Amino acid sequence: MMDSVQIRKYLPHRYPFLLIDRVVELVEGDYILAYKNITINEEVFQGHFPNYPVFPGVMLIEAMAQACGVLGFKTMDKTPDDGSIYLFAGIDNVRFKRQVIPGDRVFFNCKKISDKRGIWKFECVATVDDQLVTSATIMCADRSI
């Protein structure tokens, strides 16, 4: 549904911190399904860990937040070029269940559960090969810049 060129319209992030490769499904105001392909060429593997590359959990959480950002911007029909930014505002109930390694394709499924006064809340899960990797409740804030 959205390739990396279209995703960059809705996220201010750029290489090496753009963590969403493609959006597969998006229903405005409801949910997004996106993914990231993990390759050995990720810069983070130079230090995490050189002899045993594991994609950092914090990067998985950031990727979830970026997917939420795409859903939020698309739902509000806004972009960063409109002077708006979608900030990562909080996280609850984080769980890590499986390591992510080079060669994995991580799917991020994020569902909006509420939005009040510019704060949006999402239930998110990350999976690889239909196995749960990470789950979290993520909050994002729509702000003017």
From Swiss-Prot:
Q: What is its EC number?
A: 4.2.1.59
Q: Which GO terms describe its cellular component?
A: cytoplasm; membrane
Q: Which GO terms describe its molecular function?
A: (3R)-hydroxyacyl-[acyl-carrier-protein] dehydratase activity
Q: State its role.
A: Involved in unsaturated fatty acids biosynthesis. Catalyzes the dehydration of short chain beta-hydroxyacyl-ACPs and long chain saturated and unsaturated beta-hydroxyacyl-ACPs.
What the entry lists under SUPFAM superfamilies is as follows: Thioesterase/thiol ester dehydrase-isomerase
Write down the CDD domains for this protein, in alphabetical order.
FabZ
Annotated keywords: Cytoplasm, Lipid A biosynthesis, Lipid biosynthesis, Lipid metabolism, Lyase
User: Which family does this protein fall into?
Assistant: Belongs to the thioester dehydratase family. FabZ subfamily.
For this protein, the record's Pfam families field holds: FabA
Descriptive protein name:
3-hydroxyacyl-[acyl-carrier-protein] dehydratase FabZ
